[in-house]
Amino acid sequence: MKIHEYQGKEILRKFGVAVPRGKPAFSVDEAVKVAEELGGPVWVVKAQIHAGGRGKGGGVKVAKSLEQVREYANQILGMQLVTHQTGPEGQKVNRLLIEEGADIKQELYVSLVVDRISQKIVLMGSSEGGMDIEEVAEKHPELIHKVIVEPSTGLLDSQADDLATKIGVPAASIPQARAILQGLYKAFWETDASLAEINPLNVSGDGKVVALDAKFNFDSNALFRHPEIVAYRDLDEEDPAEIEASKFDLAYISLDGNIGCLVNGAGLAMATMDTIKLFGGEPANFLDVGGGATTEKVTEAFKLMLKNPGLKAILVNIFGGIMRCDVIAEGVIAGSKAVNLNVPLVVRMKGTNEDLGKKMLADSGLPIISADSMEEAAQKVVAAAAGK
């Protein structure tokens, strides 16, 4: 689960991390009112969407008068903000963050992530803040510094000081940087975050260290422990299909292709998408119905996929272990009839009750294209999507 920058800063503030004074605004008049309350002479008007690259897309403006605050708020609110993370369609801006201006002298980068290789938390930092860290990592990997944090001990002061020194924090500002890194780590740990990022971490001309941005991602599996985090959820920023899928315990992610995928198991789902791409197709979604799929879940999965206007074909790829093939077949038949399926459907099933499942599909009277292997299924669905 993602949250907005201003919400991330609320969390950082609770853990003692220095952030600029600011408040969210949901209208132009409210933006001006917040600016008046903060006092000038400089304010920053920032679009709030769940994507990075807002500045380059025109979603961050520096205002030097209340008239400019009004002008920029009017420009940004309601716009379709396009960044490298939103795709060409962009995301609509429904809220702003109005902040006091900052004296920017040195922009740094720090973040915390879970490293699946070491199975520990990794603190990362770079002297190249204020820009896309992916670009820095690709072109100048030597500028990315990493610290492995032992969960049993937490982030040590010596580790925080060492990283701060490596990324260029002046010696006089090291104690402030240490406090910010410790606060960031505690926020990450206590909220069950999967990512906590400050970019940029600013060192001002007088040596003050302040987090000018905040980005958090949270482990959705741990949200039951954090109602205060769930309260930050903004459904307007999420894919409606993914929201609908969560109601039926379906793991669904929308993609840009035209071939729908219905699979049981995340690993098989990813392998299925890879195989489709291998044969020249493009998956329209990731959809894992899980090991306990019911007829209702399969029917809802079909409904979700068919809401995509660009859908050209569907591939159902099932390995029947815990999940029985006859149950999937029943769901495929019911789902196809319930939604009046009007795109080609390729089905490949292997495992428990495989023969029964295939017979049910054959006897259904539906124009289902059968396949015995994943490669054959992928080739057939790619051809069907192309109208061949």
Swiss-Prot record:
> Which ranges carry the ATP-grasp domain?
9-244
Tell me the InterPro entries matching this sequence.
ATP-grasp, ATP-grasp_succ-CoA_synth-type, ATP_grasp_subdomain_1, Succ-CoA_synthase_bsu_CS, SUCC_ACL_C, Succ_CoA_ligase-like_bsu, Succinyl-CoA_synth-like
Residues binding ATP: 46, 53-55, 99, 102, 107
Q: Does this UniProt record's set of keywords contain Chaperone?
A: no
Q: Which residues of this UniProt protein bind substrate?
A: 264, 321-323
- Is the tRNA processing keyword given for this protein? no
List the pathway annotation: Carbohydrate metabolism; tricarboxylic acid cycle; succinate from succinyl-CoA (ligase route): step 1/1
Top-rank lineage group of the source organism: Bacteria
Q: EC number(s) of the enzyme?
A: 6.2.1.5
Show the GO cellular component annotation of the record. cytosol; succinate-CoA ligase complex
Annotated transmembrane regions: none
Any GO molecular function: succinate-CoA ligase (GDP-forming) activity
Q: Which cofactor does it need?
A: Mg(2+)
Q: Which UniProt keywords apply?
A: ATP-binding, Ligase, Magnesium, Metal-binding, Nucleotide-binding, Tricarboxylic acid cycle
Report the cofactor remark. Answer: Binds 1 Mg(2+) ion per subunit.
Q: List cystine links.
A: none
Q: Where does Mg(2+) bind?
A: 199, 213
Might you name a Gene Ontology BP term for this protein?
A: succinyl-CoA metabolic process
For this protein, what reaction is catalysed? succinate + ATP + CoA = succinyl-CoA + ADP + phosphate; GTP + succinate + CoA = succinyl-CoA + GDP + phosphate
The record describes the protein's role as: Succinyl-CoA synthetase functions in the citric acid cycle (TCA), coupling the hydrolysis of succinyl-CoA to the synthesis of either ATP or GTP and thus represents the only step of substrate-level phosphorylation in the TCA. The beta subunit provides nucleotide specificity of the enzyme and binds the substrate succinate, while the binding sites for coenzyme A and phosphate are found in the alpha subunit.
| Quaternary organization | Heterotetramer of two alpha and two beta subunits.
What family does the Swiss-Prot or TrEMBL record give for this protein? Belongs to the succinate/malate CoA ligase beta subunit family.
Q: What's the protein here called? A: Succinate--CoA ligase [ADP-forming] subunit beta
Source organism (scientific name): Burkholderia multivorans (strain ATCC 17616 / 249)
Q: What is the lineage of its organism?
A: Bacteria, Pseudomonadati, Pseudomonadota, Betaproteobacteria, Burkholderiales
